[in-house]
């Protein structure tokens, strides 16, 4: 089994609670609009309910809420949730923000779709995947979503900058899906 990357610690995850991180979070590249068509198309069961884990400011939750019956957006950062509520569609009546760690919060299952937008790497995989299995409808799907990669020259430069400027000096890029598959978690 592949080891968990060394930079994925609780201390590093806690940085997402910092107000300075929260304020710049909406400046990240947006998900292409097609992502929401694809995600909505994965839903084949009723209820058309979505659980968005590690939701942050709700980029996925806000993009899906008009296409489904409801979205429960879970994040452990109250500051991220507060920011998400102020963004477009963040106050939609079918979008329920839940503050807490997905490993322990009460869930309103079943869900036909569980999404994790660039957040799964921070979670306790041995805890969340069994929870997801219990929370999904019979034909439900877990979708781990990443933003489009930058073209190779930019991506290489970005990796250099991350290593130089990040306070996470032990950061190492890794393939999350490969690690999860080798752990046989789903």
Please identify what each model-predicted range represents:
Residues 51, 57-104:
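Class I SAM-dependent methyltransferase SAM/SAH-binding core
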Residues 106-114:
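A short acidic, Gly/Pro-enriched loop at the edge of an enzyme's catalytic core
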Residues 48, 69, 112:
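Conserved acidic residues
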Residues 1-45:
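Conserved class I S-adenosyl-L-methionine
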């Amino acid at each position: 089994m592949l080891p968990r990357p060394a930079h994925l610690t609780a201390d590093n995850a806690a940085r997402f609670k910092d107000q300075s991180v929260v304020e710049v979070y909406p400046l990240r590249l947006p998900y292409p609009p097609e992502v929401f068509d694809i995600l909505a198309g994965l839903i084949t069961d009723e209820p058309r309910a979505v659980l968005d884990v590690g939701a942050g400011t709700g980029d996925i939750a806000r993009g899906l809420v008009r296409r489904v019956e409801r979205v429960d957006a879970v994040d452990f950062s109250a500051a991220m949730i507060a920011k998400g509520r102020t963004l477009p569609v963040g106050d939609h009546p079918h979008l329920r923000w839940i503050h807490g760690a997905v490993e322990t919060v009460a869930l309103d299952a079943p869900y036909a779709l569980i999404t994790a937008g660039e957040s799964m790497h921070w979670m306790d995989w041995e805890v969340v995947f069994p929870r997801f299995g219990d929370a999904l409808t019979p034909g439900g799907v877990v979708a781990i979503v990443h933003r489009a990669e930058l073209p190779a020259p930019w991506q290489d430069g970005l990796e250099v900058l991350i290593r130089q400027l990040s306070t996470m000096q032990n950061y190492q890029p890794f393939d999350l899906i490969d690690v999860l598959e080798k752990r046989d978690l789903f």
